[in-house]
Structure formats: structure tokens, C-alpha cells
Amino acid sequence: MEAADPNNNLTITSPSTLLSNPTQPPAQPLKLRDSCHACASSKVKCHKEKPTCSRCRKRGITCEYFAHRRPGRKQENRAKDTTNHVERQENTTAVEMLDLNWPAPDFSTQTSIANDNLDVFHDIFVPPDQLNNGLTDFTIDFDDFDIQSDPAEIASLPDTSSLESMFVTSPTAPTDTITPNVITPNVGLSVLEGLPDTTHHTQAINLASYIQTPPTEKTPDSRIKHLEENKDPCMTRALSFLTQLSESTSRICKTSETGCSGTNKKSLPESLDGIIAENRRLLEAMSNILQCRCSEDDDLLCIQAIVASKILNLYASAIEIKPSPARVGSGVSTHTTAGQYEPQVEQQLSTRTHPQLASGRDPIRMAAQSVLGELHRVQRLLSQMLQKSKDNETMRRKGSENGLRAVADKVPLTSGVSFGSIEADLRYKLGKLSIEIITLLRGA
């Protein structure tokens, strides 16, 4: 069916006309299955006799041959595709009819409306001819502006190259080397953005109160990085620690022997905080050395043990307590027994020697409390050293079993003395010093 539009003289074909003569292939004859339904259900071989097979005849049941399902597209899917095609054609035709019947706009009406709207801005903007006259009447007398350039003033201006280098950070230069005091209100506006108004101040601005340094996190690899930064061997570092502590101990001993006349020898040394901080650094450094393969040498462990003994002596000297000597028979014995030392301790701990202990706020009491809180670090280092010594002994035993004589025949620095005995003497010395400090605090 065709419809004619009187305005556009177009011919539209309706969907019914498109479906009037569908082209369909001729129906094909149905093909029967080779097996009957009974044999196919029983999953047995069918002899394919028609109209009744021998098996169905023997069993006395009805033999039925159903139609064979042709492989490929199903009939219902084909019908569904045809329906979708018809619906799409109907939608396309409806859209075409809607576009043809839509009324055409009247541009004459819109032009008049636009002209009316433009008349509203007629009084706002100045006409071009009047604008040109106004520009010609406006003149500037540049003679009124006297620009004086004094060479001395120009020379006193800051060099821009130095300012540029101040804000450009070198890849190798640390960020904390920039001095905040060189930044003035007239320089680096982008850096000073967000700070208080300083237009009426001519002095330099101190940015130290505004710049916050982010806290540095201690990563697990910081200890390994610390070892890599120290280029000296672990043995050299341990010997340097021993030399440093020997000088400190000698200096304190000389001061206690000579002493200045008229001074109170029982006052707290001024460097107690420095002694505690330095001992912490040394203990941490020796703990890091134990993580290196150099600590497999017992000679290094013995030197570290002597350093730990020097640290205990330094703590005891800081609070004027004579350190307890090692026990008889050890590798570091000084031929002085603990029995000879106990009367001296009782004499030093008496209130007659320290009359200021009765006040409870004397410097020696505060020093004793500070030292007592640091002894656990020495104890932890001794435990790590003992564990390392056991690991080295196990490695030597395995080396002797495997025939590695270079490992098994290693002779320590202190011949005839194992690190275990030295570690036991150090623990005795540490325990004795702890008891003396506790007794001193209780006697106060």
C-alpha cells in the first residue's frame, strides 16, 4: 500500500506491502531417524526394520520412528529473527513519517525577535564613531614622568642569577641547606604564599617556624645502609671505639686523682648526658657490627667485650662508684678479688661520705637513676654477642666435620680463653654494678 504526501510529493510504502510477498524456501520432507524410539531410549542397537523392527516385534511393543532433527539453526530462532526484522522496518517507517509531518519553522518570526533583543543593548555600548573621538581626545604627557636612573642604585640591586639558584635545588644538595633568612618579602612570592601579610615590614622573614621537616622513618634496611656507608672494616671500627673509651676513662681518672682544690669532687660531671648519648651510639654501632660477617671472628667479639667493659667503667665513674673487677681465673682479671672491693663500696655508699644524699634531690642520685636505666642496653648487647659466639662455634664444628681446616683451626686472640668465660665475667660485672646502684638509691 502506498500513500502520497500532498506537500512533499513523496511515496511511502507501508510495512504490510513489504510482507505481502515473502520469499520462503520450499518445505523439505521430514527425515526419520535410523533407530526407533524404543531402541534409542534403551541405548541398544536397532536393526532398522520398518515399520516394526525385530526387537520391538519380539518384545511386543509399538515401534515408532520419530522425525530426525536437522542440525543447524532451529526453526524458532529463524522465526524470532524474522519478527525482529519486521519490527525494525516498522520503527524506521514511523520515524520517516514523523520527520515528514514535522512543521517547518518560520524564520521571519525569529529574525524579528532577534532584532528586538539587540535593541536592548543599543544604549549600553558606545557607537564606534563616538569611541574613536574619545580616544583622540585622551592624551598622555610623558614629560611629566621623570625617570632617573642612578648607577649606584642599579648596582645595589640583587643579582637575579643568585636568586634563581636559591630556588633551584641541586640533585645532590640536601634540602635543609637553604637558609630561610635570605628570603625577603620582595623575593620568592610563590614560596611566601600563605604566610602572614608582611607588606609593612622590611626585615627578612624567618621561615623556620613555617617549614616543617617530615619525620624520618626508620626502615628495616637502615641498618644495612648504615653498614654500607661505613667504609672502614669492622675490626678497625671496634678498635677505634676502644681507643675512644680509653681516652675518656683516662681523662676522668686524671680528674678524680688531681682534682681542683676547693671544688666538690662528688658533684655530677657536666658531660653525663653526653656520656649516655655516646654510649648509646657505641652500643648500637656494635650491635650493627654483629650483623656483619666480620663478627664470625672471635677476635672481634673479644674486642667488643672489652669495649662493653669500658662502657661499664665509664658509667661507674660518672657516679663515683668504683667498678667491680672481673672474677679470678678469667681472661680479663686484674688480680683483685671481689672480697677486697666490698669494704670500699660500703665506705662510698655511706651517708657520711655523701651527706647530700639525705635531701633526696642530690645530683648523684639523679645520675644513678639515669645510669641504671641504661644498663639494659649493655645486657642486650651481651646476649647478642653470646648468641653470635654460639653460632660461630657451631660453624667451626660443622667446618671440622666437612674438612674445612681454615674454619676449624681458627685460634682466637685471647688464647686459652673462650668468649663464654669473658661474657660470664661481664655479666657478673654488670650485675654487681646494678646492685651497687640500687643499694645507693635505697640508702638515700
Swiss-Prot record:
Keyword Plastid listed: no
DNA-binding span(s): 36-63
SMART domains reported for this sequence: GAL4
Comp. bias intervals (Polar residues): 1-22, 331-348
Stretches for region Disordered: 1-31, 326-348
Pfam family, one: Zn_clus
InterPro entries linked: AflR, OAF3, Zn2-C6_fun-type_DNA-bd_sf, Zn2Cys6_DnaBD
GO BP: any one term: aflatoxin biosynthetic process
Domain of life: Eukaryota
UniProt GO molecular function: DNA binding; DNA-binding transcription factor activity, RNA polymerase II-specific; zinc ion binding
Compartments where located: Nucleus
Keyword list, A-Z: DNA-binding, Metal-binding, Nucleus, Transcription, Transcription regulation, Zinc
GO cellular component labels: nucleus
Its job: Transcription factor that, with ptaR1 and ptaR3, coregulates the expression of the gene cluster that mediates the biosynthesis of pestheic acid, a diphenyl ether which is a biosynthetic precursor of the unique chloropupukeananes.
Name under which the protein is recorded: Pestheic acid cluster transcriptional regulator 2
Native source species: Pestalotiopsis fici (strain W106-1 / CGMCC3.15140)
Gene name in the database record: ptaR2
